[in-house]
Amino acid sequence: MAGKLPISVVIPVKNEERNIAACLESVAWADEIWVVDSHSADGTRDVARRYTDKIAMFDYSGGFPKKKNWALRNLPFKHEWVLLLDADERVTPGLRDEIHEILNQAEKTAQGAGVDGYYVNRKLIFLGRWIKHCGWYPSWNLRLFKHRLGRYEKLEAEDVENTGDVEVHEHVVLEGRAEYLKNDLLHEDFKSIYHFVERHNRYSNWDARVYHNLASGVKTSGSIRASLFGSPLERKRFIKRLWARLPFRLLIRFFWMYFLRLGFLDGRAGLIFCTLMSMHEAVIAAKIYEQQLQKDVSRPEAKIESAERVSS
């Protein structure tokens, strides 16, 4: 491959010293690499400077937008096409070559002019093993697209505390046509299980609000609609809305992942992964219940009842 590819890579980070080098090394072929940092306290920026001088600092004070949407809105991109990566992801040589071919076609010919984005399939490596089953593969994410045409959806959960400053499970809403790439994107966190659990504890705060919104029919502007007969993402959102109303989600999720989706074929790593993700459902359910209790306590009549119990 001669020269750099005409693409802008965006990597949002915070305290990713253990992951960022492998991620940046995997996109060294890109002409422009932006690292968007939330004031990391470790050596993340020192590592990043070995690969790029484009490091943007992100200050988050809550609300909308979070880091990825902020980057898409504000960074002075050199190129039309952007590739969004998390710090614990790596572009494989096959994916790099496929992106190279796409960009060459778009630049030299009219072929591909009608395509505005591409879905990439993430391949999760957990405890050193590819989680091929558990319902986790394939895992399609829109990551390569024309930056003016894509924004992450707004799910009315930005005001929830302790969820972090970056979009996680939101999807990109693309104003245009998208296709699917053949090669995988590796997803492997070099941090410990402690950090996995800590991260999913934050996610559960966000998920609890989203589940509540879906189950209660809260309308959100700028988000993907739920439709059984729509696009794959709209069908996925429809299923998630039904899922949010189900009882015993912890048990259902474990049975679905470990038995129905053959998670037991992924060995001990598969068992641990299914267990942790099922516990994640339990934590979400607990936080939804906690939110409901807090709402009940805040009602005027509830305060009167509480005062009467204290006085009696």
Model-assigned labels for residue ranges:
Residues 57-65:
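Short, acidic/glycine-rich phosphate-metal binding loop used to engage nucleotide
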Residues 50, 69-81:
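Active-site nucleotide-sugar/metal-binding loop of Leloir-type enzymes
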Residues 29, 50-52, 140, 174:
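Short, structured coil segments at secondary-structure junctions
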Residues 10-32:
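Short, well-formed alpha-helical segments that are part of the catalytic scaffolds
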Residues 65-66, 72, 92-291:
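Catalytic-site signature of metal-activated, phosphate-bearing donor transferases
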Residues 6-8:
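Cell-envelope/extracellular polymer assembly enzymes that use nucleotide-activated donors
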Residues 18-21, 42-51, 94-95:
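Acidic helix N-cap motif at the loop->helix transition within catalytic regions
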Residues 26, 37-47, 60, 86:
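A conserved acidic beta->alpha catalytic loop
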